[in-house]
Structure formats: structure tokens, C-alpha cells
Amino acid sequence: MSLDRTGNGYLVDPTTWSLDVMHEMAKEDDVALSESQVMQIEKAREYFDENSSVPPIRTFAKYVGIDKGKLFKEWLTGPLKPITKYGGLPQPTGCV
């Protein structure tokens, strides 16, 4: 699967995102997404559709109803960067 991406691996054209794209991007990073992680990615996309922005981690944790600490345990590199990357969303800026 060949998709245009930024230097950090984010989709250049977010409209090319799909569940298949999400799983392929994760696979390329040697990440097997759990059901919980897929749900978080879908909720991040929902939040973005409603607010036209990527939420800060504290806001996102409340939005999905998961403790912030648990989010960090599920995503070893921190939650919002892989969630937005695999979700076809813009790369977060600032403190996430």
C-alpha cells in the first residue's frame, strides 16, 4: 500500500484514511493494535470531526472515559502521537 506521508509518517491527505490504512501503518511500525486502541483511534477521529482539532491528552482521556495513566500504559510511546498517526489525523503540536 503506497500512501503519501510526511517525514514523520502522517498521511498527507487525511481523506485516504481507512481501517485498512490504519492497520497497515501500525503493522509497518511493528504495532499490533488492540480493540481498545482501535476504539481510541476512532474516538479521536470523532473528536476531530466535532472540534476540527486534536485534543490535549487530558481532554482526550475524559472524552474516551479512560484514565490518562492507562492511556500511557497502552501506548508505550505516549498516546496521542500514534493515535493521530494511525487515525489519519494531523500531527499534534505542543504538549500532548
Locate each region found by the language model.
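Helix-rich interaction surfaces within compact, conserved domain-sized segments
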Residues: 5, 56-96
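A general alpha-helix detector
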Residues: 21-25, 43, 56
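Amphipathic alpha-helical segments that form the core helices of the histone-fold
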Residues: 41-48
